[in-house]
Every structure is written in structure tokens, then in C-alpha cells.
Design a protein with these regions (language model features):
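Short, flexible helix-loop junctions that flank or precede catalytic/ligand sites
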Residues: 1-171
């Protein structure tokens, strides 16, 4: 029985063989989704190189890398403006308090903070030429890339999560 799927989902890429299959499937016209354990989107490229993938295959096969984390959401009923001043961050922030609704936790539910690294021709060329992670990040920032921490900081400014929670999860 021959199969020719348009979309391939690989649960997790853990070894060189799985990575090679995923990259080659992508190059032959398949849309491939998978997971890879890294701290951020740009580190996924480094991880693939560490797994012996060829730079030109990565550059040609990748379209998008997403990194994400879940942060606890502040309870809407009991959160309060924080009296703490975070010298390195501008803005007003909120903190967890605790009430019956959130079972005295101060948090209720979770929210995703993520970063999206779109692989355009320039980033593909940076990958092919073994550019440093910092060079890729610098270029991506010029194109509007926001790190998970920056996205999380915005969520904290909006009162959706706390700085303490953000630092616990991301830093």
C-alpha cells in the first residue's frame, strides 16, 4: 500500500534519523509539523545542526519555527497592582493575591506566550552560511520578531500574568 500524505505530523524529533526524514519530506512538498526540545525558536536551528543536519537542508526545508510556554494567568477577581518596582522593566504590573475563586492561589488558568520565527530568504542564507544565533536574532528583530520574554512582558503589562510568573517560566 503506497501512501502520499500532504501533511505529516511527527510527534517529536529525538534523533538524527527522524530529523533527516522530516527535512527530506519537507523538501519533497509535504507540510511537516513536529516538536523539538529547545529553549527558544532560534535555538531550534542550532539543535538541528547539532543533530548533524546539513545547513542547506535546514535552510531549504524550514518555513516557520514556533516556541511556546504556558504561564499562569492572574485571577481576574483578586489580582492587584504590584507595589514592587522592577527597575529593568518599564510599566505597571500586577501580582497574585488569592481568593476563594482561585483557591487562594492568585492564579486561574493559563495563557500561552510564544515566539514565531518566519524563515525568509535572508534567514535561510544566514543558516546556510553558519551565522551566529545573535546574527539571526538581530535580523529577525529588524523584521518584527519578538522573543517569548518580550511577549510575556506585554502580557504582564496587560495584567494577564505577573512578572514573577514570567521569570519563573522563561528565565
Amino acid at each position: 500500500l503506497r501512501q502520499d500524505p500532504d501533511i505529516i505530523v511527527i510527534g517529536e524529533i529525538r534523533d538524527e534519523e527522524s530529523l533527516d526524514i522530516a527535512l527530506k519530506a519537507s523538501l519533497t512538498g509535504h507540510l511537516v509539523f513536529s516538536t523539538l526540545h529547545t529553549n527558544d525558536a532560534i535555538s531550534a536551528i542550532t539543535r538541528m545542526l547539532d543533530m548533524k543536519a546539513k545547513d542547506y537542508l535546514i535552510a531549504s526545508a524550514l518555513s516557520l519555527v514556533i516556541a511556546q510556554r504556558l504561564v499562569r494567568k492572574l485571577c481576574e477577581h483578586c489580582k492587584r497592582k504590584s507595589a514592587k518596582h522592577y527597575n529593568e522593566f518599564e510599566g505597571d504590573f500586577y501580582e497574585a493575591v488569592g481568593c476563594e475563586l482561585c483557591k487562594m492561589n492568585g492564579y486561574f488558568g493559563r495563557e500561552m506566550v510564544s515566539e514565531f520565527l518566519f524563515i525568509d530568504e535572508e534567514i535561510a542564507e544566514l543558516i546556510r552560511t553558519n551565522a551566529k544565533t545573535s546574527e539571526i536574532l538581530s535580523y529577525a528583530r529588524k523584521k518584527g520578531f519578538k522573543t517569548m520574554f518580550e511577549v510575556g512582558l506585554q502580557r504582564a503589562r496587560e495584567g494577564k500574568t505577573s512578572i514573577d510568573e514570567l521569570l519563573r517560566v522563561i528565565k
